[in-house]
A protein has these predicted regions:
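Conserved PLP-binding catalytic core of the aspartate aminotransferase-like
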Residues: 141, 290, 299-333, 349
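PLP-dependent aminotransferase class I/II
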Residues: 70, 224-308
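PLP-dependent enzyme catalytic core of the Aspartate aminotransferase-like
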Residues: 329-338, 342-375
Length: 375
């Protein structure tokens, strides 16, 4: 018997998540002095000064002790920031862990998990790994205000008696598209209470469009809704791996039964507590991203590319031809972007909105790739 056959049926059907290139590994492989990393939607401004100070003050001798398993100080800080009950908060080793934990906790083999076509890759992986039947719902057409966005009518039609979990990212990664308040509210009313709706708001802090709802406001009206957020993006703490979910306390209590003990380390807890309280820093990050996102959009469009609307810290660009050669040529010039072939978008690349000089460097390299390397 092959070892793989010893795995559960869901795991046997599973492909590992592709996190993209490690910048240092690819730099050494290509023999380049440095790499410009614009493939993972990280925050070039980094964490706030208050977070940096908190981490400087931590004694490394603390590393011999287990962290607070309940992360009470951090949960209280998150609760205070969003006006929720601390018992409604579940912490994860990144929101990725929470998305998987929700499937592991609530889904049984034979249940259906509904998610949009071009939704975050982890949705499908979590569904398959839990032994569920993944129901991938066709997206909106490319022509329209929300190209390749989640189709609310199709998502509603996909709901059935076996639906146990619904995943939706707002704004969506990788398309950058979103549902407005009315669309999301109408959808939530139609979801039976026998199913849990997970709204992933990893990019919430970057939103500057007023019609994009804060899902926490809607979640308070629906006991079967869970909102996930992360400290990896706008808060600049990707390396510390920390995210959180907010739901009704009863649902959060069930998640506590399956959440790994000590899944959030001591340093991540301290940094995140400082980060969530620094509202001014997050606003500076949002404003800087909004400005640079439009600069980058204009530059990409000037190169003749179709650029999807976005409320995140990234842009999806369609090259109208296979994008893999473009990605490879950019790598040789020291620039990392994210290919979208795995999402069924082989003509597209997702590009993180960087700092001003990073965006200038990307546009210069891309122009040379299109007009020289691949001309």
């Amino acid at each position: 018997m092959q070892i793989e056959q010893l795995a559960s049926p869901g795991v046997q059907r599973l492909n590992a998540y592709d996190p993209g290139y490690d910048p240092e590994t690819i730099r050494q492989m290509l023999g380049l002095p440095r790499m410009l990393e614009l493939g993972s939607n990280e925050n070039g401004l980094g964490p706030s000064a208050s977070v940096r100070e908190v981490l400087k003050q931590r004694d490394f001798e603390d590393a011999i002790r287990y962290p607070d398993a309940g992360a009470r100080k951090l949960r209280q800080a998150i609760a205070q920031r969003w006006g929720v009950d601390p018992r409604a908060i579940t912490l994860g080793n990144g929101s990725h862990e929470l998305l998987v934990l929700l499937a592991e906790t609530f889904v049984a083999p034979g249940d259906e998990v509904v998610f949009p076509q071009y939704g975050f890759a982890v949705f499908k992986l979590a569904a398959i790994g839990s032994g569920a039947l993944p129901v991938q719902v066709s997206a909106l057409p490319r022509e329209g205000a929300q190209p390749f966005g989640a189709d609310p009518d199709a998502m509603t039609a996909a709901l059935g008696p076996r639906t146990k979990l619904v995943y939706l990212a707002n704004p969506n990664n990788p398309t950058g598209t979103w549902w407005d308040r009315t669309t999301l509210a109408r959808f939530l009313v139609k979801v039976p209470h026998s199913a849990i709706v997970v709204i992933d708001e990893a990019y919430r802090e970057y939103v500057d469009e007023r019609q994009v709802p804060d899902a926490l406001q809607l979640a308070s009206l629906h006991p079967h809704v869970v909102v996930t957020r992360t400290f990896s993006k706008a808060h600049g703490l990707a390396a510390l791996r920390i995210g959180y979910a907010i739901s009704n306390p009863a649902l959060a209590g069930v998640l506590e039964r399956t959440r790994l003990t000590f899944n959030v380390n001591l340093y991540a807890q301290a940094a995140a507590a400082a980060a969530i309280a620094d509202v001014d820093h997050v606003e500076r990050v949002r404003a800087a991203n909004a400005e640079q996102r439009e600069r980058l959009r204009a530059g990409l469009q000037k190169l003749g590319l179709f650029v999807f609307p976005s409320q995140g810290n990234f842009l999806l660009a369609d090259f109208a031809r296979p994008a893999k050669p473009v990605e490879d040529a950019l790598l040789k010039r020291g620039v990392i972007v994210r290919p979208m072939g795995g999402y069924g978008l082989p003509t597209c690349l997702r590009i993180t909105v960087g700092l001003g000089h990073e965006n200038d460097e990307l546009l210069d390299a891309l122009g040379r790739v299109l007009h020289e390397d691949l001309a």
